[in-house]
């Protein structure tokens, strides 16, 4: 009866051409009329899911997360931010709907110290001085249950591992794409032995490494199976594994969004204690002993951030920017500088500026690609611009693809002075249709007047096609030996990368080279060739957007088709949650 009323209501409203927002509110009204207000509140999860399906919001991460297993956390947030059921429509609908404030568009401002020194544009580092070599790994996503021969194309976003559907496929002899001996591109994560093979290759071919940066996301994409116990185990296991291959090399980790339990959800301390992430930070503090200064353990164990003076005149800052993750639902309660991480960053940069030190920042989530809350991304942008003379390296991950991002003196004007470049390194995991890869930077070394800027970098990748075909004789290959030579750069400075974007507008050879490296030459990337101007403009616009504004792309004629995002980690629970929900008669719609 209730379902019939809903269908009739939607059909009638469709003839009147009312908005989806009004349809959504009508559904809530009908449910309240049928159930009563108390039951409507009790069944808010089921209403949310029904709204998601009815209005096809499957591509909205907010909606997809709701139907996961983590209803306790979600319900706490909902009770804090929703006063009336109508506001659920305001939360879920992409358009303006009701009086609920869209957390994805909320802007707030940090107080940033004045007295900024005159900006000194970065110059190409002259040759002849000592250099440092730094390894950059990101998005390891190691799957301890990866099983050779299981279905790699299993129909869910996480394959190559034992699960009901996969086992049934194997037993019936219906395997379309067996999981390869060394990994499988697509919906599979990193086998542990692929990780160790990579580390062995680096140890034997890279020469002396001065330090290693790991920009987060250690665990697999099996988000429904996340627990504090499994995450703590993986933090220790993978930290110990890296240490075993590089016992004398310091390693500096950053917190990734997949370190959250639930995924993406790093709870600030304004939430009840049972949701706090102290267990994660303590596990990291224990696993990273010897790499983290004793005086930074308190900071690490509070909000996942720390600083270390790694050389005379150079500091490493590990910033936990999952506190800016757009899918961290705790931030929908209050996203203004959670746990004081950005104020902590300001304090660290001010201390460095006061004594003339340079700073490298290792973090996980770039401010672009719609992955960060705009308020957080814009505040971070302004902080880095304030300390543009101090920050000489930013090393991120998360996107799985190889990218760079420009920062400008005016965050909304690509014609203003380029101030910084952000490096987003390629992932180790083949998940999201890329071959595994890693990067090694050459950096201006320890000497009087060192800039500690990146001079150049090389990139290596693992061709899963050829290596799975010859599994007893695998090899890592050089994707390119020098980024400067590959892209015709005079050096790793903002003006050169800004000019590279300009050149790629018309230089087909240069753009195609960048596009191929972005995909690590993977023929499995599932994307159509980028042969038209709209596609090209999407990549060029991406490189300018370290926060979300189209004002940085107004000169790109012919339209913009943004690159496809990486695979949606939430859809893994979509079908199973639907099936589980159908059995809930007490809230059945």
Swiss-Prot record:
Zn(2+) 2 binds at residues 217, 257, 364, 398. Binds 2 Zn(2+) per subunit. It catalyses: an N-(acyl)-sphingosylphosphocholine + H2O = an N-acyl-sphingoid base + phosphocholine + H(+); a sphingomyelin + H2O = phosphocholine + an N-acylsphing-4-enine + H(+); an N-acyl-15-methylhexadecasphing-4-enine-1-phosphocholine + H2O = an N-acyl-15-methylhexadecasphing-4-enine + phosphocholine + H(+). One of its GO terms (molecular function) is hydrolase activity, acting on glycosyl bonds. Residues 578-589 have a biased composition (Basic and acidic residues). Keywords: Disulfide bond, Glycoprotein, Glycosidase, Hydrolase, Lipid metabolism, Metal-binding, Secreted, Signal, Sphingolipid metabolism, Zinc. It is found in: Secreted. Belongs to the acid sphingomyelinase family. This is Putative sphingomyelin phosphodiesterase asm-3. It comes from Caenorhabditis elegans.
């Amino acid at each position: 009866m209730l379902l019939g009323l809903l269908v009739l209501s939607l059909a009638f409203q469709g003839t009147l051409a009312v908005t989806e927002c009004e349809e959504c509110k009508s559904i809530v009204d009908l449910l309240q009329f049928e159930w009563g207000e108390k039951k409507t509140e009790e069944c808010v999860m089921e209403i949310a899911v029904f709204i998601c399906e009815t209005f096809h919001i499957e591509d909205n991460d907010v909606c997809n997360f709701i139907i996961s297993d983590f209803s306790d956390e979600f319900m706490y947030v909902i009770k804090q931010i929703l006063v009336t059921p109508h506001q659920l429509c305001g939360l879920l609908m992409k358009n303006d709907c009701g009086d609920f404030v869209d957390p994805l568009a909320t802007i707030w401002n940090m107080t940033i110290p004045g007295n900024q020194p005159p900006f000194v544009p970065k110059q190409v580092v002259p040759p002849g001085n000592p250099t440092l070599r730094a390894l950059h790994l990101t998005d390891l996503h190691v799957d301890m249950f990866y099983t050779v021969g299981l279905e790699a194309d299993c129909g869910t976003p996480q394959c190559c591992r034992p699960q009901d559907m996969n086992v049934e496929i194997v037993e019936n002899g219906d395997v379309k794409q067996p999981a390869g001996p060394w990994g499988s591109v697509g919906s599979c994560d990193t086998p542990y032995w692929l990780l160790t093979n990579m580390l062995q290759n680096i140890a034997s071919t890279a020469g002396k490494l001065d330090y290693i940066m790991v920009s987060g996301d250690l665990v697999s994409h099996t988000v429904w199976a996340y627990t504090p116990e499994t995450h703590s185990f993986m933090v220790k296991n993978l930290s110990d594994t890296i240490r075993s291959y590089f016992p004398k090399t310091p390693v500096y980790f950053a917190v990734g969004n997949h370190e959250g339990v639930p995924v993406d959800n790093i709870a600030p301390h304004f939430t009840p204690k049972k949701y706090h992430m102290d267990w994660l930070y303590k596990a990291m503090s224990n696993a990273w002993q010897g790499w983290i200064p004793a005086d930074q353990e308190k900071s690490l164990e509070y909000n996942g951030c720390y600083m270390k003076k790694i050389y005379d005149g150079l500091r490493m800052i590990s910033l936990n920017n999952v506190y800016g993750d757009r899918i961290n639902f705790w931030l929908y309660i209050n996203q203004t500088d959670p746990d004081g991480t950005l104020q902590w960053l300001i304090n660290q940069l001010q201390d460095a500026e006061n004594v003339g030190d340079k700073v490298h920042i290792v973090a996980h989530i770039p401010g672009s690609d719609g992955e960060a809350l705009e308020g957080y991304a814009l505040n971070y942008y302004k902080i880095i611009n304030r300390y543009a003379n101090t920050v000489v390296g930013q090393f991120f991950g998360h996107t799985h693809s190889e990218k760079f991002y420009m920062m400008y003196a005016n965050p909304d004007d690509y014609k203003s002075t380029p101030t910084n470049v952000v490096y987003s390194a390629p992932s180790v995991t083949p998940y999201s249709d890329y071959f595994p890869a890693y990067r090694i930077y050459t950096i201006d070394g320890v000497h009087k007047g060192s800039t500690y800027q990146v001079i150049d970098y090389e990139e290596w990748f693992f061709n899963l096609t050829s290596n799975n075909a010859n599994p007893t004789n695998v090899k890592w290959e050089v994707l390119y030996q020098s980024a400067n030579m590959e892209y015709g750069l005079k050096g790793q400075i903002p003006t050169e990368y800004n000019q590279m974007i300009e050149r790629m507008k018309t230089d087909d050879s240069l753009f195609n080279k960048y596009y191929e490296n972005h995909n690590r030459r993977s023929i499995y990337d599932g994307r159509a060739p980028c042969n038209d101007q709209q596609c090209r403009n999407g990549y060029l616009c991406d490189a300018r957007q370290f926060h979300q504004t189209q004002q940085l792309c107004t000169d790109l004629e012919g339209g913009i088709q943004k690159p496809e995002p990486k695979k949606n980690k939430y859809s893994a629970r979509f079908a199973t949650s639907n099936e589980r929900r159908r059995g809930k008669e007490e809230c059945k719609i």
